[in-house]
């Protein structure tokens, strides 16, 4: 490649490792005439994690292709999305994001002087922008706005108006930043197509949209800021990185939903153009790969062991994180991190004495500790013909004993080694002399011919994976549900099986990171 890349070489750099491009022909035309103007925006909500290296590596590609790149710190969006960033923390979050993202870019050798950094509220509160928000609201339907934000904005039963404004503001950003293209994750696709539909209604042109794939988290599926064990924080200590990688989902030979392999593909290879598997001489010694697919093929063939893969990623990842940790090891940035993300347990000191006038506890699904389980053994209860006693692996050191009344409905052979859904924080109780340490959740149709089916996690799920209601991923479950408060009973009243056999709470899906919880056939059934 010469000093100035050709339009074809620029196109390759811009689009490599992307999952989808909308408007590729327009992109080609622009590259024939001039440099591409592009922006990447990030809402300043939770702490950035290592998956942010995916857009960082693409920003490096854009700069190599000669693009003019703007990074938007979308502080107003962070507030509009169900107040994921409280108003009083917006400035602090923006400062944290700016420092940590600049540190990430420096760690991969990206020259900061070639980038433009801008804060959303620097222009989104202007008279012109505000007028365009009103103009847009006069042509956009509620349906289209909600649909556009479905993969990005927190989904709740009664959405706030702020969340419905979010997609429109993101569309307007393309015009007000004067760019040709917007770059983001494939989870932004509906917002991108929303922008393509509605910007012309205001007399503005369609933009090109570039989408990178979502990197699976360490437990499978999308890496999430709200799922602690699925992500590695940029400031995690080396021992924490090793611990999380050790627990990562990485089955021998399995290349699907493999967050470890995906991180190598989308971050380490684009940055270094090679990856070294570090291993003992007894197992063949170190091996250098210069093409990702060669590594994937060897892993699929079990030539590369998961332990060696994880150890090698551990070394490579810590080389990226070391400069970031070093930068944040100053009193000023330590103080910033603490102020931008205050410890919730220290925000409100406990009042002395009983809190008689305190507000009632919120009854929400995140209070339930529901997990994927695998039935290890199943036997008839020694003293009850209608009960099974199961030993179920729910991701703990020892399997739990669970008693369930399924003898009349599910043959023993169908339960053995089956993946199930278990409620784990009910108070243990004895059932005919055997203590049950959880509840195996099932769909049921009541009546004379009662039918019962255990709920099914998505294929590929692992014992211990958290089950949550979409939109309620955050929050820690109660350590133990207090029987007198009837939290489970109140929530259970809105549990239902949909017409598509999906388990739901108030018409919102129960999920793991791999997809929705379902049952075999009991449409419209209850869940207990």
Swiss-Prot record:
Residues carrying N-acetylmethionine: 1
Reaction(s) this enzyme catalyzes, per UniProt: tRNA(Tyr) + L-tyrosine + ATP = L-tyrosyl-tRNA(Tyr) + AMP + diphosphate + H(+)
Residue positions, PTM N-acetylglycine: 2
Modified residues (Phosphoserine): 205, 386
Pfam families, alphabetized: tRNA-synt_1b (PF00579), tRNA_bind (PF01588)
Subunit structure: Homodimer. Interacts (when binding to resveratrol) with PARP1; interaction stimulates the poly-ADP-ribosyltransferase activity of PARP1.
Protein name as annotated: Tyrosine--tRNA ligase, cytoplasmic
Species, as recorded: Pongo abelii
Lineage, highest ranks first: Eukaryota, Metazoa, Chordata, Craniata, Vertebrata
Gene: YARS1
